[in-house]
Amino acid sequence: MDKLEELENKINELASEIERLKAEEKENETGKLEHGDVYWFINHIGEIKLATWYGDPEDTTRYELGNAFIARWDASFKVEQLKVEAALKRFARPFEENEQNVILKYAHDTNKLLTGHHLYSQYGNIYFDSEEVAYKAIETVGEERIKKYYFGVNG
């Protein structure tokens, strides 16, 4: 990658970050969309679409389901997050009482993905039969994607 491409990528990243911060600021100010505001949502096949808020049942249902995003970046992030969770769940099984339930963990001090055993069910955890299955999931889905979209860790 040459210097020009590098700079263009950085500009695009910064533009996305500015859009996200502006949207976050607006969301913090209002807490909800107002009549005539534009927002993004994810349709039934994972495409990101633009809509105008009229407060109709379609708008409010999207909002209540967490599928109304002020910034396109947030909708894009959510699509990737859903993809990663779906890919991990292909290796998963339901929580089993009194069994070793292997989960993924993120170690902030070492920036590594680890596995752990859980005897308690916890919302949001994805459970695996064994550490081998968990590591196969990591290998298949990608460690960096899991860190970013499952654990919400940047860099």
Task: Identify the residue ranges that each predicted region occupies.
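Structural boundary micro-motifs
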Residues: 1-155
